Every structure is written in C-alpha cells, then in structure tokens.
UniProtKB/Swiss-Prot annotation:
Its main location: nucleus. Belongs to the nucleoporin Nup85 family. It is found in: Nucleus, Nuclear pore complex; Chromosome, Centromere, Kinetochore; Cytoplasm, Cytoskeleton, Spindle; Cytoplasm. One of its GO terms (cellular component) is nuclear membrane. Keywords: Acetylation, Centromere, Chromosome, Cytoplasm, Cytoskeleton, Kinetochore, Membrane, mRNA transport, Nuclear pore complex, Nucleus, Phosphoprotein, Protein transport, Translocation, Transport. This is Nuclear pore complex protein Nup85. The modification Phosphoserine is found at residue 223. One of its GO terms (molecular function) is structural constituent of nuclear pore. GO terms for biological process: chemotaxis; lamellipodium assembly; macrophage chemotaxis; mRNA export from nucleus; nephron development; positive regulation of DNA-templated transcription; protein import into nucleus. Essential component of the nuclear pore complex (NPC) that seems to be required for NPC assembly and maintenance. As part of the NPC Nup107-160 subcomplex plays a role in RNA export and in tethering NUP96/Nup98 and NUP153 to the nucleus. The Nup107-160 complex seems to be required for spindle assembly during mitosis. NUP85 is required for membrane clustering of CCL2-activated CCR2. Seems to be involved in CCR2-mediated chemotaxis of monocytes and may link activated CCR2 to the phosphatidyl-inositol 3-kinase-Rac-lammellipodium protrusion cascade. Involved in nephrogenesis. The modification N-acetylmethionine is found at residue 1. The gene is Nup85. It comes from Rattus norvegicus (Rat).
Length: 656
C-alpha cells in the first residue's frame, strides 16, 4: 500500500518576516539554520543596510529535556531487546512476550510522567511550571493511547475479557477518584461529606462495585431510614454477573445471568424501591445503563471514553471488538452533544476503536511533539505483524521511516546520538546510508568522543568514514603541533599523502632541534612504516640513530648508505645524512669500505654540482651559503681520508 501525504501545515517562526527580507536556510541533522539575506525581496539588486538576524530552528526540542532523556535512554534498551528477541518469538509465548514489552514501554512513560509531575509541582517559575504541566499532559495522553493499542492490537482481547481490560484502562487513567476517596474517608462523618454521593457515583461509573457497597454501608449506618434501600442496592451490586479472569463460564451463560440480573434491577426501579432517595435511584438507573442518567454525570466522568466504557459495562458487557467503533462514535457524539469539536486525542482514540492502525500512527505523528512515541509503537506493532502491507511511496516502510526520523532527531543531541546508532542499525533498507550521513556531521569536540565515533564506524566496516574521521583528527593534531598524534591518526586512516606530510614535519623538527619527539611511536611503527616512502625513511632514519647509539657502527653505516643510494631519502635531507656520516668517517676503525666511500662521494658531488631549479631557494642556498660550502669541504676531506684508509686496509687484508 502506498500513501501520499497532503500538504504540510505552515509553521510560523516568531520574528521572521519573509515578506520584507529574502531568507536563506540550511538543513542540519536535527535543526535548521535560517537567516535574513542582505537583499530586499522586492528588488534583489538593492541591498538593505541592516544587520541580518540568524535563527536556529530545532524540530526535536524534546531531546534537550533532562527528564525526557531518561525516557529515551530507558526505551532504547527495551527497543534493542525486542529486536534481539525477535528470533526467539514463536507460538503462544510470542504474544505474551510482546505484551510484556508493551508494558515495559508503558512503565517507562509513567515513570517519566510522575517525575515530570513532581518537577512541575516544585517549579518556582510559573512559566516553567506550566511548561512541565503541559509535558505531563502529553505523557499522560501517550500512555493512554499506548494502553488502548496494547488492549486492541497486542492483547487482541476477545468479547468478555475485552471489557475487563477497558475497565482497567479507564481506572488507570481516570484516577481522580482516589484523591476524592481519601478526602471523604478522612472526614469525621464520611456519609455527611459534601462529596460522598459523588464518590459513590464515580465508583459505580468505574465498575468498582465492592468499594461502592462499602460506602453504602456507611450511609446505612448513619441513616436508618435509608438502610433498607442501601441493603437492596448493595445486593444488586454484589450479584451483578462479571466475567472474571479465572472464571470458566461461557459468554452465553454470562449473558443469561446478566439478563436476569438486569430484569431484577428494572423490577426494583418500577416498584419505586428507591423513590425515597434520589441518589440511590440514580445509581440504579446507571446500573441499568440509562443513557440520560449517565449523561447527567458528565462532569464526574470528564471524558467520552469513560462514558463509553461505563455504557458498555451496564448495557453490553460482552461487546465484540468489531462493534466497538459503533459504540465509540455514538458515545463521542452523545458526550460532546454538538457543543464542541473532537480534540486530536479524541480522533486518535476513535481511530484505535475503529482498528485503523495507520490512522492512529498518522494522527499521533501530527499531534505529538517528537517521533519517540510513533517510532516505538510502530516498531512494536510491526513485530505483531500488523504493518507488513503498508509501504510508503519513497522506498521504505512505515516502521523504518519513523525509526529513521526518530534516530535523526537523536543525532542532534551531543550525547543521545549514541542511541540513534542502534536505531539506524535495525533499519535494513536505509539505515546504513542514513548512519553514514549523520555520523559524518557529529562534531568531534574531544578525542574521547572521536574514539567513540571511530569505534562505531570500525565495528560496521564504514571504511570511508573511518578515513575521514582520522584525517580530521590528524589535521587538528598538526595544527596543535602534536606530531605524534597526527602521525598515529594518518596511519590509522591509511592516508599516504598525509603520513608523508607529517613525516616531513618530524624531519624538519629534527633539523631544527637535533632530536626526535615521540620516539616510542617512531620506534614501533612496524609494518605501518610502509604506508609511504617518507614514513619509511623516517622509521629507518630513526633506526640509524638507534644503531649509532648502540655503537653498532657497521650496521649504522650500511643503513645510512642504503637510505641515500635507494633514493628513499628526500634530496633536501641528503646534506643532513652526509653530515651524520662524519662521526663514522672519523672513527679510528674504518667503518665505510672503499666502495661505500665512493658511493658517498658520488652522492656528495651530485648534491653539490646539481644546478638549482627555479623556485628552489633551498638548493640555491646550498651553493651560496658559506656554512654549506664549509660542510661540503669538510665532507670531501673526511671522505678522502677514509678512502685512503679503506684502500690501505683492504690492500693489507688481500696481501695477508
């Protein structure tokens, strides 16, 4: 099934006047940057001499709420657990497991709502208090909707148990009766309390007949004239047939018993048993499901779905799921009475009673301020195999689309982005691509955060992103003159060009300071040394110094010569290498053979005689600078002396 959305509603941004100024904008992962240009909209060539304003518009502001972040964190664990549980779900246990997951989600919502309620009470700023109270109302509505969806779509309660679930639903979400009960029972004479009959009526409206009977017994004790009527009505409440969870009676048996009980209630009403007490008579009419009497108690029920469940309890307790929408629509119409229009919450609940899952999700997406609710509910319903046929026109299904939107919002937050990674992982169609796009936009403020991002990319074989992140960190390290860190990141990125650049910086620093920094890193390059010629040279040149320091002069001389003759050393560094050869040439023992000395002499003359090319001031300075000339002369003298010594030594060895 494909679905095309209608035109989105226009959102007005305070302070932005697009009629006077031309606007430009840029989308980010979780927000939009909007700014006024310097051009007048009516005449683009005329510049407006005023300072433009910049606006940052966030679409998912809820991620910045400290309390809601707990909701996101807790539900993330439930979500991941559900995805991993999918392979184990089968048979009868599947439904029980899914119901358990749904209740876990609801418990997280309720815990968050209760904490938000406490914060709202403690708020000193009236504006903050109103904001928190508004958020409490939203969370309450979310739990209300989720609970109903759990009953209808996940529990799939049949006729009979369906009403029991709906009664629990109403009792859970219409809880003013508890505070009312505490007030009445806490008084010296409960039956004389001004809210006594309101309390009894609400208890009957919610089907809490045992509690209602206890209240009537207090009235009977306090008013002997009403004792008989209270006893009769209490007996009717006690004998009302209700299908309890452990009861084995069939629906047919229940309907027969209920019909007999109803006839007895009608008989007492016709006999004017309660005529002397209007309150008791009203209660009897409620138990008969009299709609006019029920509507008189609108204020006590406060909403139409309470009216619906009470109406079903006393008129059709074995209602079938397929008939729910008829009762729901008529209850809504009767309760509103044409005086007001349905609210968004009413439309969502009505869609649920009509078993229109897609409409529920669509209405929730419009009404709620973030994607958390619809993303997790849709995912759960998808695991119930209720959404397989619903594909969107741009190549994804509804579950994946909503999860992608939710995860994108998480990436706008400095720490919640880590949760978003798992949501992308469980989107088989577009999750990988979306993760790649979003992870590149994470600001790498600290090395610790960068390592987290890098680990995530490496675990998912995101080679391109790994390279990109390593290059960014290498550049930052170079700018901060942390050459060891820069070299480490360039090696990790397998970036030969950048490794060459950093190696050059190491060599330049050596020329200026006469020693290497980050020796541990250079000494342990290992196979990474082969990433670039310059890095290889750096590693080998450091090895030359180590051999020299260990007085392994023969090995050091061979390595130095190989660095020059193999052309791996940059020509600009040849003079440094030849200068490093001087101490070896001056040793008492002959280190360089005649052949090796000839090679060094060739390199020196090649360096001294090569004509500098245009734009190479370093080579020009080689001939012009007196210091360099002195070095060349010293090297020639040392090489000549070493050659003579080597020839004599080699001749002596041959003669012997």
């Amino acid at each position: 099934m494909e679905e095309l959305d209608c035109e989105p509603a226009v959102t007005w941004i305070p302070g932005v006047n697009s009629k006077k100024k031309q606007m430009c904008f840029d989308w980010g992962p979780g927000e939009m940057l909007l700014c006024e240009t310097s051009f007048n909209k009516t005449d683009k060539s005329e510049k407006v001499p005023s300072c433009p304003f910049i606006y940052i518009i966030r679409k998912d502001v809820d991620v910045y709420s400290q309390i809601l972040r707990k909701l996101f964190n807790e539900s993330h664990g439930i979500f991941v657990g559900l995805q991993r549980l999918e392979e184990e779900l089968s048979g009868k246990s599947r439904k029980a497991q899914l119901v358990r997951v749904s209740k876990n989600y609801r418990s997280v919502i309720r815990a968050c709502m209760e904490e938000m309620h406490q914060v709202a009470i403690a708020a000193k700023d009236p504006a903050s208090g109103r904001q928190f109270s508004s958020q409490v109302s939203i969370l309450s509505a979310m739990e209300l909707i989720w609970n109903l969806c759990e009953i209808l779509f996940i529990e799939v309660a049949p006729a009979g148990p369906l009403l029991l679930h709906l009664l629990d639903w109403v009792r859970l979400h219409v809880c003013e009766v508890d505070s009312l009960s505490a007030d009445v029972l806490g008084s010296d004479h409960p039956s004389k309390h001004e809210s006594f009959w309101n309390l009894v009526t609400v208890l009957v409206l919610q089907g809490r007949l045992d509690e209602a009977r206890q209240m009537l017994s207090k009235e009977a004790d306090a008013s002997p004239s009403s004792a008989g009527m209270c006893r009769v009505l209490g007996d009717l409440m006690r004998t009302m047939p209700i299908l309890s969870p452990g009861n084995t009676q069939t629906l047919t048996e229940l309907e027969l018993k209920w019909q007999h009980w109803r006839e007895e209630c009608e008989r007492h009403l016709q006999d004017n048993t309660f005529a002397a007490n209007p309150h008791l008579e009203s209660l009897c009419k409620i138990m008969l499901g009299d709609e006019a009497t029920l509507l008189e108690q609108k204020e006590l029920m406060s909403n139409w779905y309470h009216f619906l469940v009470t109406r079903l309890l006393y008129s059709n307790p074995t209602v079938k799921p397929t008939d729910l929408h008829l009762y729901a629509q008529s209850s809504l119409d009767m309760f509103l009475g044409g005086e007001s229009s349905p609210e968004p919450l009413d439309n969502i609940l009505m869609a649920a009673f009509e078993f229109d899952i897609h409409q529920v999700i669509k209405e929730c997406s419009i009404a709620l301020s973030n994607w958390w609710f619809v993303a997790h509910l849709t995912d759960l319903l998808d695991h119930c195999r209720l959404l397989q046929s619903h594909n969107l026109y741009f190549g994804s299904n509804m579950r994946e689309f909503l999860l992608l939107e939710y995860a994108s919002g998480l990436f706008a937050h400095h720490s919640l982005w880590q949760l978003g990674v798992d949501y992308f992982d469980y989107c088989p169609e577009l999750g990988r691509v979306s993760l790649e796009l979003h992870i590149e936009r994470i600001p790498l403020n600290t090395e610790q955060k960068a390592l987290k991002v890098l680990r995530i990319c490496e675990q998912r074989q995101m080679t391109e992103q790994v390279g990109s992140i390593c290059k960014i960190l290498a550049m930052k390290a170079v700018r901060n003159n942390r050459l060891g860190s820069a070299l480490s990141w360039s090696i990790r990125a397998k970036d030969a060009a950048f490794a060459t650049l950093v190696s050059d910086r190491f060599l330049r620093d050596y020329c200026e300071r006469g020693c290497f920094s980050d020796l541990d890193l250079i000494d342990n390059l290992g196979p990474a040394m082969m990433l670039s010629d310059r890095l290889t040279f750096l590693g080998k040149y450091r090895e030359f110094h180590r051999l020299y320091g260990e007085k392994r002069f023969g090995d050091a001389a061979s390595l130095l010569l190989s660095l020059m003759t193999s052309q791996i050393a940059p020509r600009s560094f040849w003079m440094t290498l030849l200068t490093d050869a001087l101490p070896l040439l001056e040793q008492k023992q002959v280190i360089f053979s005649a052949e090796q000395t000839y090679e060094l002499m060739r390199c020196l003359e090649d360096l001294a005689s090569r004509r500098p090319e245009c734009g190479e001031p370093d080579a020009q300075r080689l001939q012009d600078d007196d210091i360099e000339t002195t070095k060349v002369e010293m090297l020639r003298l040392a090489l000549a002396r070493n050659l003579a010594r080597a020839i004599i030594r080699e001749g002596s060895l041959e003669g012997s």
